[in-house]
């Protein structure tokens, strides 16, 4: 019997995400027929309702034999998440687990010992707190809202926001790396809108401390695949801000640093990841300051992805494109980021980005 080296792991898969490009090539290497639902890049929103979603599945002959690969887009779609969990196999973590862990206040209190803590929360507005909608993602539905339903108020923690990206196999974790997260500057409607990330170094002592906590967390909730945790450091305490038991934006940083990352996420292999380089990586998502019609000037920008079509109308506060950076030196990459944003703002009416860096 001869092994077919071109046979792929899955016959059919459905990718659900806001921004498909960073996952597309990796997934098509292992899937014969890939279907994509991406509200950011498709005219029709197939996640508008469960009925619309079911019609999309029927039209494309997508049934329970199709594997679901989830990144984003279902944060407030409870009925679609429940339907997918019941009828399909979800690569990585199921959507019930995603919903549970997306709210850190659902976590077992025994995880929060010593200097790993959660910000205080309140049901009432307080000027030192920020408003957050349950299952918020990417800085959306986070701000200073006093009158919306389905929100809570979280103690504001000053300082930079970081994240740790890791793989889990239900028992233990492998830390991929640590990142600083960036946000859009001077956006009144979305003051905490996520706008990119940059990889960081961490010494061995700190690495072991984080790994012990993440191993306990991963084992307790039997996590699978690519996950990330957003946090802040203040007064010698680590404040857990958000937990993402799913593919997230920092995947684009580590797909360049490790070999076959998507294979590990969907469970095709359980071995240790092989690092292919030790460079620093970063990316910046540019958001439209006003409605913007794409023209040829964007092609003057270097190393861009998630590129819109010429003539496409980008609505205010929606992503336009992504700038990508790499360097062998952590100081040089920050300079590249600053220069890249400056160049982009000369030709695109986009928001600036907060780049506080320690």
Question: What would you call each of these model-derived segments?
Answer:
Residues 263-358:
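Peripheral (often C-terminal) accessory segments that flank ATP-dependent C-N-forming ligase machineries
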Residues 1-93, 339, 352:
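ATP-binding N-terminal substructure of ATP-dependent carboxylate-amine bond-forming enzymes
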Residues 111, 126-142, 150-164, 176-180, ...:
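ATP-grasp fold ATP-binding core
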């Amino acid at each position: 019997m001869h092994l077919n080296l071109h046979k792929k792991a899955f016959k059919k898969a459905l990718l659900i995400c806001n921004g498909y490009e960073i996952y597309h090539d990796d997934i098509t290497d292992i899937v014969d027929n890939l279907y994509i639902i991406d509200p950011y890049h498709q005219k029709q929103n197939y996640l508008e309702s469960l009925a619309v979603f079911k019609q999309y599945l029927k039209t494309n002959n997508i049934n329970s034999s199709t594997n679901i690969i989830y990144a984003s887009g279902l944060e407030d779609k409870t009925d679609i998440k429940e339907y997918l969990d019941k009828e399909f196999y979800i690569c990585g973590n199921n959507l019930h687990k995603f919903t549970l862990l997306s709210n850190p206040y659902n976590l077992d209190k025994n995880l929060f010992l010593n200097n790993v803590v959660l910000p205080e929360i309140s049901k009432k507005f307080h000027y030192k707190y920020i408003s957050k909608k349950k299952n918020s993602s990417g800085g959306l539905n986070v701000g200073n809202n006093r009158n919306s339903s389905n929100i809570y108020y979280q103690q504001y923690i000053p300082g930079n926001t970081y994240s740790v990206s890791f793989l889990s196999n239900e028992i233990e974790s492998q830390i991929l790396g640590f990142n600083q997260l960036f946000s859009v500057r001077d956006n009144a409607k979305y003051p905490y809108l996520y706008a990119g990330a940059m990889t960081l170094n961490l010494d061995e002592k700190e690495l072991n401390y984080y790994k012990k906590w993440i191993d306990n967390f991963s084992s307790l909730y039997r996590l699978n695949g690519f996950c990330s945790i957003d946090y802040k450091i203040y007064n010698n305490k680590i404040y857990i801000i958000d937990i993402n038991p799913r593919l997230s934006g920092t995947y684009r940083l580590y797909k360049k640093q490790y070999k076959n990352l998507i294979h590990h996420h969907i469970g095709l292999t359980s071995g240790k990841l092989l690092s292919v380089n030790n460079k620093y990586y970063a990316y910046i998502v540019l958001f439209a300051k006003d409605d913007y019609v794409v023209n040829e000037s964007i092609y003057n920008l270097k190393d861009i992805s998630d590129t819109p079509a010429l003539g496409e109308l980008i609505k205010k506060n929606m992503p336009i494109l992504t700038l990508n950076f790499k360097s062998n030196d952590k100081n040089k990459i920050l300079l590249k980021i600053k220069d890249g944003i400056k160049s982009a703002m000369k030709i695109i009416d986009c928001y600036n980005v907060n780049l506080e860096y320690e």
